[in-house]
Amino acid sequence: MRRLFLPLGLAVAFLSPNFAVAQSDTGTSMVPVFPREAAGPLTLEAALSLAAGSNFNLSAAAKELDSTEGGIMQARVIPNPELKTLVEDTRKSTRTSTAQMNIPIELGGKRSARINAAERTRELAQATLAGVRGDIRAQVIESFFSVLIAQERVKLATGSADIAARGAQAASRRVAAGKISPVDETKARVEQANAELELAEATASLQSARQALTALWGNASPQFAEAQGNLDALPSRPAPELLQKELENSPLVAASRAELDRRQALVGVERSRQYPDLTVSLGAKRDTEANRNMAVIGVAIPLPIFDRNQGNLYSAIRQADKAQDEYLANRISLTRNLLMASNQLSVSRASAQTLKQTVLPGAEQAFNAATIGFEAGKFNYLDVLDAQRTLFQARIRYLGVLGQTYQAATTIDRILGR
């Protein structure tokens, strides 16, 4: 009896958790460290580098990809054997003891189906990571140029406020000299107050844009002095036909396709579970009363009479059909958004060029002429205010069109994963 159960006891001891290989604990609590950009000028390359190294959405997607390796590792594992003991009769002289090992054997391709599903999950995580990386890059570029535009708006509002202040002073002098009505001075003061409000709003918008940019690498308090970049270099992208061809390699399309593949792989997993597994039993039986040992050999297989995994298989098939529809719908949506962004980019570029080459120079000439004419007494102050307002609106519109241009370009890059 002792000889029979000694190997069993040793096996149980070695298989206990105390003898298991210790796994490293990566879930320790730690305080996140948020990087800060340099206090000097900030370039687009520096902003992209900071976001790539410190954005938590990006690191979370990378860890999700890393976790799928564990799923593949587990999918490759075969089922554990089972040790079983049985004692018949508690009297020592007539006791019968049995020790056996039950070895499950998977049938129906369950292991290969599991591995295939786990690998498809890894591909989905890879495509998701690429999509997140492209999205973060597009966000950084869009936010960076938003800061550039906000900086220009502050400069514009500052200049407009200075012009309005000088105009109010000039109007005051002309009123004192009796050359214009005090009503014109009041209008000049109102225009000066409006210009100061525009400057305050532009300053607040710049601060919000700066915070939105640095938040992409976890810094809530911007440290950089200013963003350095060239707004005059308008972005350009290939023709819509070429963009549609690039869409095939987009991470967003790849992620949708990978989800479809994963769902189809899960159908294979559920289909493999329709086949019952075989259990082979090997062991020894000790009959103390007869003083003899006997071999124990057995085979067990479930009869799939009622449960054939039909419900889970049906659900998996419908989920795969759903993934197919979502993939097609996603492609249609991405194509539509891509073409809309391409059209918006073309229109915005044309508008920006027209404003820069025609509207802005004309508005500046009209304002300069009105100012000189007012100082010479040829125009009234209403003409100056009207010219100043036209120039300011033209510049604001130009900055708005620039923002639309860069937004359309970054939308294209986000869709294509550039």
Swiss-Prot record:
One Gene Ontology term of the molecular function aspect: efflux transmembrane transporter activity
Region forming the signal peptide: 1-22
GO terms for biological process, alphabetical: response to cadmium ion
Taxonomic superkingdom: Bacteria
Induction (UniProt): By zinc, cadmium and cobalt (zinc being the best and cobalt being the worst inducer).
Biotechnology and industry use: In the presence of 2 mM Cd(2+) or 4-10 mM Zn(2+) up to 99% of the metal is removed from the culture supernatant and is sequestered via bioprecipitation. Additionally Cu(2+), Co(2+), Ni(2+), Pb(2+), Y(3+) and Ge(4+) can also be removed from culture supernatants, although it is not clear which efflux system is responsible for all these substrates.
KW Transmembrane (keyword) present: yes
Database matches in InterPro entries: OMF (IPR050737), OMP_efflux (IPR003423)
GO cellular component, as recorded: cell outer membrane
Keyword terms, alphabetized: Cadmium resistance, Cell outer membrane, Cobalt, Membrane, Plasmid, Signal, Transmembrane, Transmembrane beta strand, Transport, Zinc
Pfam families: OEP
Cell location: Cell outer membrane
Functional description taken from the UniProt entry: CzcC protein appears to modify the specificity of the system, perhaps by acting on the CzcB protein. When the CzcC protein is added to CzcA and CzcB, the efflux system gains specificity for cadmium and cobalt.
Protein family (similarity comment): Belongs to the outer membrane factor (OMF) (TC 1.B.17) family.
Protein name (record): Cobalt-zinc-cadmium resistance protein CzcC
Native species: Cupriavidus metallidurans (strain ATCC 43123 / DSM 2839 / NBRC 102507 / CH34) (Ralstonia metallidurans)
Gene name in the database record: czcC
